[in-house]
Amino acid sequence: KYNVNDALDVTNGEIKIIRAVGNPEIKTITSNMVSGFDSSKENTKLPLTVSYTENGETKTTKYDVSIKDTVTAVSMKNTPKTEYKYNEAIDVSTGTISVTKGSGTKDIAITENMVSGYDPTKLGKQTITITYGGKTTSYEVNVKDYVTGISITPNAITGTYNDELEALINGNDIIYTVTYAKAGATSPRALTESMVAGYNKTSLTDQNSTVTYTDQDTNSYTNGKTFTTNLSVKLKNEISKVTITKPTK
């Protein structure tokens, strides 16, 4: 068996010389005895002729070889996506590998059926193996948990005209909870005034203030992204003072 563009190899090849008289003789085949070898293209059954000349007389015998354009090596050309969120399918659409065969080297696109070793439910670094033509190369990916949203409790409160936001938050013990795709809900934390926008202490109409949370978890896929929910606020117009004008009588 030969690869495309391989040189002829007659190592361990022998012929048996049978003469009219005497015992048979074993001769080592040399490359100059062989004709018909052409490894420039594939051939499943290429006949080679072995010629032996003695005393001006030449005898021949034949054997067959196969020529196949076989993969000898693969290497990563363009690494595909390496950062994934929990339970995300692998994406190799931007990846290419360099494939070396007997005929030369060319770049081909990575397809999903070449990939092994990926588990979208396992957080952390993983080694991904690419297999092509019996040869392999690999690269590393990182699967991270991610924030799916936030919630606040309570999410609707009442107050009095001109109440400060901080007083409303503290007086109602408002907490917020961050939920991750895999880890689930985290321990509740106290809401801070800086997280709330859109509150007007002098408005008596129903208000929907926006609560914003920025993911600062460096191990999270959504690190740096913001998530919002609404805080419903209703201020009452309570009597703050009564004055009197005395009757004239």
Listing of model-derived features with the role each one plays in the protein:
Residues 22-67, 81-82, 103-139, 182-228, ...:
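Serine/threonine-rich, repeat-prone extracellular segments and beta-strand-based repeat modules
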Residues 64-73, 141-149, 231-240:
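Short domain-boundary/entry signatures in modular proteins, especially
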